UniProtKB/Swiss-Prot annotation:
Region Disordered, annotated ranges: 83-258
Subunit annotation: Associates with trfA to form the trfA-tupA corepressor complex.
Pfam families on file: Tup_N (PF08581), WD40 (PF00400)
Protein name, per record: General transcriptional corepressor tupA
Family: Belongs to the WD repeat TUP1 family.
WD repeats, residue ranges: 279-319, 325-364, 367-406, 413-452, 455-494, 501-540, 543-579
Keyword S-adenosyl-L-methionine: no
Keywords for the protein's UniProt record, in alphabetical order: Nucleus, Repeat, Repressor, Transcription, Transcription regulation, WD repeat
Statement: the UniProt record of this protein carries the keyword Repeat: yes
PANTHER family, alphabetized: F-BOX AND WD REPEAT DOMAIN CONTAINING 7 (PTHR19848:SF8), WD40 REPEAT PROTEIN (PTHR19848)
Compositional bias of kind Polar residues: 83-101
């Protein structure tokens, strides 16, 4: 018995020793773990510091690059202005008409130069000089177009404006004088919906013709107009008659109130024609096609509409009767992928999803604190992303009826209102443009912030993914478009191309279904077609009397492509293009 007790005691002692050894080992491991974690945190902090330093250096380098590029552009503009002044003096002479005889010497006229200078000052607050732009032509009425590349800049003449040739310099001068006449006749610009608390002075929905800041220069222009020589009076009378014809709603002929200009330095088969003119009761803030291309949705004050693309007839109208006082502009409309629902975002800070067939509200999403400016559906129809003036973008889960993610915080989120949002074709990414000049990218499935794209000099008002999802286009108040490369590593944002050519704010951008065209709408009242592969503009369309606030292309191309424009002139227009 005694031996057994001793044996048990010995075993217990051995077990206790092993437990003590294990505890000692465990404490060593814990100590090593703490040491490793401390080292890891220190290295992570150092890495973050290095990354932040690199980011600051890159941002500083980009700012210096932008500054130097701007200085170079200013010097180029000074040189171009000398050529422009010479060509403008030639514009005021009889040599602007076709003639087989030698042109007479140009007659210099100080009054005409004053008109040009005053108009340039009114239309360009930053003293930017006019760039050389493609030569405009009148839309064809059935005959094939024959565009020639020539060093002299000659182009074909179309019926509608008489014997006078049009190039962009003449067209710009004509437009400036037409705008003066319209302002004199109207007495004040078109009132656009208020966008407080965003920067209302610069928002596209308030892009009317502001008279207060230009009254003195307008008076100077009026005095100069009264002193023009006989030839200018004849040309001005022709323009008045042309403006009168353009303002009449009845008896319009194809091409009587819209112009197309083609770039003489490139060969293109691009042709444009007007399909339907869709009159509205207020500013058209947004346009959007259904996925099958059969319907177009528009948003204006207090209502959203759906039109049949083939006939141009209104087939549905959606009005929220709960809000009956004051204005309620529909800032954004978007079809669900199956075409059964229409999402709308408005000044009431809510996202509404309408059943198109019953015209009833299916869902209402609350959560934004300010006006909603942009919406987009995911490709599977399960989510909607919205952008608001509250500096946030939100992803809404339609099935669960709640917000899945809020994109944006004090550290990496927008510093000002979100003006535009877009979902990538595969539904994995969300892009947002903001008034702080930056485009941001998030993971739509996790809500994690991925990247920021800097380079614009002013607020970003529109973003759009390319059909293959490898590029992102942005349009800005700095009058430019940028194309960002998403195909490689996102550790460094890379601007693939910058598109310059608009003379005022770029308010909307969109890709064609095959990605071969990038189109943009601007406050300068024009739509431009760009080749995203080389940054070349092929065509400029002038088909509205006020800012082109929204552009959209039909996802389906049959015999020809279709695109839509929405404008401050109370009209949306459907166009077809062949390329």
């Amino acid at each position: 018995m005694y031996g057994r007790t001793a044996r048990a005691s010995e075993l217990l002692d051995n077990l206790k020793g092993e437990i003590d050894a294990l505890n000692h080992e465990l404490s060593l491991y814990k100590h090593q773990k703490d040491d490793y974690e401390r080292k890891f945190q220190n290295q992570l902090a150092e890495l973050n510091t290095i990354q932040q330093t690199l980011y600051d250096l890159e941002r500083g380098q980009n700012k210096m690059k932008i500054h130097y590029e701007e200085e170079i552009r200013q010097l180029k503009r000074q040189l171009e202005q000398q050529n422009i002044n010479a060509s403008q003096r030639d514009l005021n002479s009889p040599s602007t008409f076709r003639s087989n005889s030698p042109a007479p010497p140009a007659q210099h006229n100080n009054n005409n130069n004053n008109i040009i200078n005053n108009n340039n000052n009114n239309n360009n607050n930053n003293n930017n000089m006019q760039r050389n732009t493609p030569t405009p032509t009148i839309p064809d009425k059935g005959q094939p177009k024959q565009r020639q590349r020539s060093g002299s800049g000659e182009f074909y003449q179309q019926p509608g404006l008489g014997p006078q040739q049009l190039n962009f310099q003449q067209l710009n001068l004509q437009q400036q004088q037409q705008q003066l006449q319209q302002q004199q006749q109207q007495g004040s610009g078109q009132s656009f919906p208020s966008l407080s608390p965003l920067d209302s002075n610069r928002h596209p929905k308030e892009m009317g013709n502001n008279m207060s800041g230009n009254s003195m220069s307008m008076n100077n222009n009026n005095n100069n107009l009264n002193k023009k020589p006989d030839m200018e009076e004849v040309k001005e009378e022709d323009r008045r008659r042309h403006d009168t014809e353009m303002s009449e709603e009845n008896g319009k002929e194809k091409g009587t109130d819209w112009l197309v200009g083609y770039n003489p330095s490139v060969q293109t088969n691009l042709n444009i024609d007007l399909l339907h003119n869709l009159q509205h009761n207020s500013v058209v803030c947004c346009v959007n096609f259904s996925n099958d291309g059969k319907y177009l949705a528009t948003g204006c004050n207090r209502s959203a509409q759906i039109y049949d693309v083939d006939t141009g007839k209104k087939v549905h109208a959606f009005v929220d009767e709960s809000e009956k006082d004051g204005d309620l502009y529909i800032r954004s409309v978007c079809f669900s992928p199956d075409g059964n629902y229409l999402a709308t975002g408005a000044e009431d800070k809510t996202v509404k999803v309408w059943d198109i067939h019953t015209k009833k509200i299916q869902h209402t999403f609350y959560g934004h604190e300010l006006d909603i400016y942009s919406l987009d559906y995911s490709s599977d129809g399960r989510f909607i992303v919205s952008g608001s003036g509250d500096k946030k973008a939100k992803i809404w889960d339609i099935e669960k009826g709640k917000c899945a993610f809020t994109l944006g915080n004090e550290e990496v989120g927008p510093k000002n209102g979100v003006t535009s949002v877009a979902m990538s074709p595969d539904g994995r990414l969300v892009a947002a443009g903001s008034l702080d000049n930056i485009v941001r990218l998030w993971d739509a499935q996790t809500g994690y912030f991925l990247e920021r794209y800097e380079g614009h000099l002013d607020s970003v008002y529109s973003v759009a993914f390319s059909p293959d999802g490898k590029s992102l286009a942005s349009g800005s108040l700095d009058k430019s478009l940028k194309l960002w490369d998403l195909s490689g590593s996102r550790s460094r944002s890379r601007c693939r191309a910058t598109f310059n050519g608009h003379k005022d704010f770029v308010l909307s951008v969109a890709f064609s279904p095959d990605g071969s065209w990038l189109i943009s709408g601007s406050k300068d009242r024009s739509v431009q077609f760009w080749d995203p592969r080389n940054g070349t503009t092929h065509m400029m369309l002038q088909g509205h009397k006020n800012s082109v606030i929204s552009v959209a292309l039909s996802p389906k191309n049959n015999s020809h492509g279709v695109f839509a424009t929405g404008s401050g002139d109370f009209r949306s227009r459907l166009w077809k293009y062949d390329s």
